[in-house]
Amino acid sequence: MKYQQLENLESGWKWKYLVKKHREGELITRYVEASAAQEAVNLLLALENEPVRVNVWIDRHMNPALLNRMKQTIRARRKRHFNAEHQHTRKKSIDLEFMVWQRLAGLAQRRGKTLSETIVQLIEDAEHKEKYATTMSTLKQDLQALLGKK
């Protein structure tokens, strides 16, 4: 395992995940009967500040179909948490208009690269173009100076 598991922190994430799914209308309990499901949800809501008991609730009451998705979500959250500790691995976000994002995503897909790699490539292309234009301008001025002197 690449990232250390922190039980208290991850239990809090699990609690937030389950509460969010419940508020979105998903069935988070294994119970078909509405009253039993609501009772289990009420119990979960009362466990907000008791992370160790959240894991017990998950073992007893959680919908098994939700287990895999929750594990994936927690694994991704753990990765982001540990990557955020170092500047070079921390993810940054930028606001893009949808059309810009769509064009960038299309370009990245055509090039077979990630969005970040595509952006770096576009920046490098622009820098090379700028350097080429400067070099050509200098050569043109030098050539004019040589021809103008004679």
From Swiss-Prot:
InterPro entries: Arc_rbn_hlx_hlx, MatP, MatP_C, MatP_N, MatP_N_sf. The keyword DNA-binding applies. It is found in: Cytoplasm. One of its GO terms (biological process) is regulation of DNA-templated transcription. It comes from the Bacteria. One of its GO terms (molecular function) is sequence-specific DNA binding. The keyword Cytoplasm applies. Keywords: Cell cycle, Cell division, Cytoplasm, DNA-binding. GO terms for cellular component: cytoplasm. It holds the Pfam family MatP_C. HAMAP family: MatP (MF_01073). Homodimer. Required for spatial organization of the terminus region of the chromosome (Ter macrodomain) during the cell cycle. Prevents early segregation of duplicated Ter macrodomains during cell division. Binds specifically to matS, which is a 13 bp signature motif repeated within the Ter macrodomain. Belongs to the MatP family. This is Macrodomain Ter protein. It comes from Salmonella arizonae (strain ATCC BAA-731 / CDC346-86 / RSK2980).
